[in-house]
């Protein structure tokens, strides 16, 4: 029930992506459109839409933008027909990379993603080439404070169906199956705990460490992928070092 923080790599990625306000607004808007398209425009009956709206509000996306995105997703407003596309590839030293995109033009996006891989020492792979190196899981983060009883929180999470619970330096990490992610999340919230982050993500089964030279190349590749407007998420199996330890 403990071990190396799974959230560390994700948090590092999110902080870099969220630093660009315009970039995160684009991503949040697309998340809302996708959720509304898949499950309808009512957040009371569409948990994915509810989560997308919560994230948007937490990042100060204007309510007008949120409502417009919902209407685009349900078809009330005209707009581009977004499709979800998954790309798999390799970075420096054979590192595994998964790219999730939402696009209105798959040919354009595929060409751009391939170009980024090629220019930065990587290569685009076939479907299934690296996904076997990852597990799709739900991850829920509750920040530590003196009022939280670790054993009680663990019991709430495990009783609701969580796979794993761990206490890290600054937070508690709860891992779930994607299928019961929402159920566990709601049980934790109902018990009175404040969730700081919650998402379904791809966690590498094993991480690898790179030499300083390869790590620099790898970061440039990831940065360029994340700068692409169609890219929603980038997952990889590289161990992110704590910058405070360098």
Swiss-Prot record:
Residues 1-21 are annotated as: Disordered. Disulfide bonds: none annotated. The lineage of its organism: Bacteria, Bacillati, Bacillota, Clostridia, Thermoanaerobacterales. NCBIfam families: PRK00110.1, PRK12378.1, YebC/PmpR family DNA-binding transcriptional regulator. InterPro entries: Integrase-like_N, TACO1_YebC-like_2nd/3rd_dom, TACO1_YebC_N, Transcrip_reg_TACO1-like, Transcrip_reg_TACO1-like_dom3, YebC-like. It is found in: Cytoplasm. Belongs to the TACO1 family. It holds the Pfam family Transcrip_reg. One of its GO terms (biological process) is regulation of DNA-templated transcription. Its main location: cytoplasm. This is Probable transcriptional regulatory protein Teth39_1009. It comes from Thermoanaerobacter pseudethanolicus (strain ATCC 33223 / 39E) (Clostridium thermohydrosulfuricum). Keywords: Cytoplasm, DNA-binding, Transcription, Transcription regulation. The keyword Transferase does not apply. GO terms for cellular component: cytosol. The keyword Cytoplasm applies. GO terms for molecular function: DNA binding.
């Amino acid at each position: 029930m403990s071990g190396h923080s799974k959230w560390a790599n994700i948090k590092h990625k999110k902080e870099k992506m969220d630093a660009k306000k315009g970039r995160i607004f684009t991503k949040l808007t697309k998340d809302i459109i996708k959720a509304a398209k898949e499950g309808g425009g009512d957040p009371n009956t569409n948990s994915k839409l509810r989560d997308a709206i919560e994230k948007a509000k937490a990042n100060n996306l204007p309510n007008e933008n949120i409502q417009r995105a919902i209407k685009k997703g349900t078809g009330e407003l005209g707009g581009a027909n977004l499709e979800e596309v998954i790309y798999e590839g390799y970075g420096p030293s054979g590192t595994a990379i998964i790219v999730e995109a939402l696009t209105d033009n798959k040919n354009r996006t595929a060409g751009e993603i391939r170009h980024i891989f090629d220019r930065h020492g990587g290569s685009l792979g076939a479907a299934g080439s690296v996904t076997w190196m990852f597990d799709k899981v739900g991850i829920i983060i509750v920040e530590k404070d003196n009022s939280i009883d670790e054993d009680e929180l663990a019991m709430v999470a495990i009783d609701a169906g969580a796979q794993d619970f761990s206490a890290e330096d600054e937070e508690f990490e709860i891992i779930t199956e994607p299928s019961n992610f929402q159920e566990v999340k709601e049980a934790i919230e109902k018990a009175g705990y404040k969730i700081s982050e919650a998402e379904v993500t791809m966690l590498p089964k094993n991480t690898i460490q790179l030499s300083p030279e390869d790590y620099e190349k790898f970061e440039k590749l990831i940065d360029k992928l994340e700068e692409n407007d169609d890219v929603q998420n980038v997952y990889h199996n590289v161990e992110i070092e704590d910058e405070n330890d360098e």
